[in-house]
Amino acid sequence: MHEIYLAGGCFWGVEEYFSRVPGVTDAVSGYANGRGETTKYELINQTGHAETVHVTYDAKQISLKEILLHYFRIINPTSKNKQGNDVGTQYRTGVYYTDDKDLEVINQVFDEVAKKYDQPLAVEKENLKNFVVAEDYHQDYLKKNPNGYCHINVNQAAYPVIDASKYPKPSDEELKKTLSPEEYAVTQENQTERAFSNRYWDKFESGIYVDIATGEPLFSSKDKFESGCGWPSFTQPISPDVVTYKEDKSYNMTRMEVRSRVGDSHLGHVFTDGPQDKGGLRYCINSLSIRFIPKDQMEEKGYAYLLDYVD
């Protein structure tokens, strides 16, 4: 088993989140990297310890990079001594490691995350100096108190983390060579294909749909439904991390445009008339923006890590 120590604000939510991540074998709340080897909850603002979760994981099931991508999903990495409504040095963010070999991956992830922000990261990156296991009543707090305070959305643990660095965007020159003129017009020039005459509007085989420009996974067949609009429709992306949103006021309408995270491809729009039992959203997506990978080809094409997220 491997381990990493993660400070991300109030440890109740961080512990609960990581306890739900496949491949994590244990998550224990405690206090790390303060002054001295002893402390308790009432004293951590004096002893300088940070509320921290000791995450133990099976490296055969989940990598350190994936653990860190989960971590950065749930924190504000530019906020110093504050996460959610919690303020104080005990709520600072930090990644504390016990194996120097992990530092290469940690540095890589920090560098990738830093590029997304104008402000410097406020996340500590240090050897673990000390760790004090928190009092019993803090352990599994949200399991024992399901309506207890939590500053993060622990339900996001159900979604896969998708490593953006695996799917770099080709140059415009390369895209013009690899995409058809119609695919280029839709993804790069914000055009829209015709309804009911596109390749995926009535396709419901098991598999995933990836960005036609980069190959980044975007949608799963398990979230696809027949909406009657004539375009592929989904209740949600395969992960909330892989799409971005932009207000679109073209054609004298106000709509919410959906774009891919890495490729910045125009995908379509999201509307609020989807199935109510699935959240009420309808992602109306151009077939020309995506490529379908059948379930039986996912392993061959490098998407085996998403097989559990396909029906």
Curated annotation (Swiss-Prot):
Active site: 10, 284
GO molecular function terms noted in the UniProt entry: L-methionine:thioredoxin-disulfide S-oxidoreductase activity; peptide-methionine (R)-S-oxide reductase activity; peptide-methionine (S)-S-oxide reductase activity
Gene3D superfamilies given in the database record: Peptide methionine sulfoxide reductase, Peptide methionine sulphoxide reductase MsrA
InterPro entries recorded: Met_Sox_Rdtase_MsrA_dom, Met_Sox_Rdtase_MsrA_sf, Met_Sox_Rdtase_MsrB, Met_Sox_Rdtase_MsrB_dom, Mss4-like_sf
UniProt xrefs under SUPFAM superfamilies: Mss4-like, Peptide methionine sulfoxide reductase
Keyword Oxidoreductase: yes
Reactions the enzyme catalyzes: L-methionyl-[protein] + [thioredoxin]-disulfide + H2O = L-methionyl-(S)-S-oxide-[protein] + [thioredoxin]-dithiol; [thioredoxin]-disulfide + L-methionine + H2O = L-methionine (S)-S-oxide + [thioredoxin]-dithiol; L-methionyl-[protein] + [thioredoxin]-disulfide + H2O = L-methionyl-(R)-S-oxide-[protein] + [thioredoxin]-dithiol
First-tier enzyme category under EC: oxidoreductase
GO biological process: protein modification process; protein repair; response to oxidative stress
Ranges for domain MsrB: 172-295
EC number: 1.8.4.11, 1.8.4.12
UniProt KW Heme keyword: no
Keywords tagged on the record: Multifunctional enzyme, Oxidoreductase
GO CC annotation, single: cytoplasm
Stretch list, region Peptide methionine sulfoxide reductase A: 1-155
Function according to Swiss-Prot or TrEMBL: Has an important function as a repair enzyme for proteins that have been inactivated by oxidation. Catalyzes the reversible oxidation-reduction of methionine sulfoxide in proteins to methionine.
Sequence similarity: In the N-terminal section; belongs to the MsrA Met sulfoxide reductase family.
HAMAP family attached to this UniProt entry: MsrA, MsrB
Protein name: Peptide methionine sulfoxide reductase MsrA/MsrB 2
Protein source organism: Streptococcus pneumoniae serotype 4 (strain ATCC BAA-334 / TIGR4)
Gene this protein is translated from: msrAB2
